[in-house]
Amino acid sequence: MATASEILKQIKENDVKFVDLRFTDRRASLQHVTMDVVCVDEDMFADGVMFDGFSIGGWKAINESDMVLMPDTETVHMDPFFAQSTMVIVCDILDPVSGEAYNRDRRGTAKKAEAYLKASGIGDTVFVGREAEFFVFDDVKYKADPYNTGFKLDSTELPSNDDTDYETGNLGHRPRVKGGYFPVPPVDSAQDMRSEMLTVLSEMGVVVEKHHHEVAAAQHDTLVRNADELGIKFKMQIYKYVVHQVANAYGKTATFMPKPIFGDNGSGMHVHQSIWKGGKPTFAGDEYAGLSESCLFYIGGIIKHAKAINAFTNPSTNSYKRFVPGYEAPVLLAYSARNRSASCRIPFGSNPKAKRVEVRFPDPTANPYLAFAAMLMAGLDGIKNKIHPGKAMDKDLYDLPPKELKKIPTVCGSLRQALESLDKDRKFLTAGGVFDDDQIDAFIELKMAEVMRFEMTPHPVEYDMYYSA
């Protein structure tokens, strides 16, 4: 871990002008405050920086609004997008009275989950990798007032532009609906932009792997290595930040909404997970697909608590528009080797170090700290209570006959159902004080307000179906 004096030395050597203190709010959005370097000294690293917690939705009442941003010296990196030389430091949120971690700080929850894993004796390290898909549009317009509600998206890749007149002519090369996976340019119009994203991510300390066009028109995926422990090192937030910034630099707009377009594939965030102990993988063994019994129990915990986990892994009303059979969405709670129609997939790999579980139902609107911590707690509950996931489902689950299909449990069908499931099934989360009831209740209250707004707002489709009734 770098010391405050070492970071101050870096600031001087790199002629840094500003230090940007960042944290993640309850809705998984990045927040920041920028400090002039004249204010950055060893006292700042020891005492932190005060800020108004009341102005961050759902955190503190106005009569107790003071909170502390405590810089984490392990998270230092430079921001390549700012005009002035700026160093970024991720912060934990502390209570100024007790000096302890604030219980509603998501990053603190992830740290508690890691500590709980170590205390359990099951493992000492959890590795989490993620594949977060996204869309990039040329133009987006939306309105949500009482007398004008709707949205309009545009991208040269959209099939709706087949007959659009452009000044330079319509060149015609674009993906078809559900036909955009892996084409070369010119059908893939974003090759250079995605390469730029990976280049910037690498410069910011993220170990990158590959990128490609995804199934839907205007949909993309860039992959980074599985080297983060519960997202604590901020890699997922850096990833989303870079995607947004690079797209913006190209004159485009990126979104991690799970289902921005009806009738085409949505965006997921597949989360790869494995537990290690003493430098050895605990998920490798002699059971199904080369897994250990412990790994099967981990999967059993994920499946048992999936509906409660959905509140954290799929925390938007839009998340549940993605859960439709036929669009590669992992609706069914089953596990299988290589089978992408199962919600828990075992990627192929002969090396024991590669043995892992890929949970496919999360999406990129999730707060990574909460989502990763919740999945770990569910998996550990499965191991502790020996929850076997049952028989693997190696057939195409999308083609099962209705009678057989009804026997397989599913993810939640709405955010309301997910929040209700979380309210009823929370004991596995509060084990070891990782989550607490105040935090869970506050999260449910915050998200239920979104549900109510969504449910009470007339939808353009309702006009299409019912206006002439």
UniProtKB/Swiss-Prot annotation:
Cofactor note: Binds 2 Mg(2+) ions per subunit.
Enzyme class name: ligase
Family recorded in the similarity comment: Belongs to the glutamine synthetase family.
Protein name: Glutamine synthetase
Pfam families membership: Gln-synt_C, Gln-synt_N
Function (record text): Catalyzes the ATP-dependent biosynthesis of glutamine from glutamate and ammonia.
Primary site of residence: cytoplasm
InterPro entries, per the entry: Gln_synt_N, Gln_synt_N_sf, Gln_synth/guanido_kin_cat_dom, Gln_synth_cat_dom, Gln_synth_gly_rich_site, Gln_synth_I, Gln_synth_I_adenylation_site
Database matches in PROSITE patterns: GLNA_ADENYLATION, GLNA_ATP, GS_BETA_GRASP, GS_CATALYTIC
Binding site for ATP: 209, 272-274, 340, 345, 353
Reaction(s) this enzyme catalyzes, per UniProt: L-glutamate + NH4(+) + ATP = L-glutamine + ADP + phosphate + H(+)
Binding site for Mg(2+) 2: 133, 214, 221
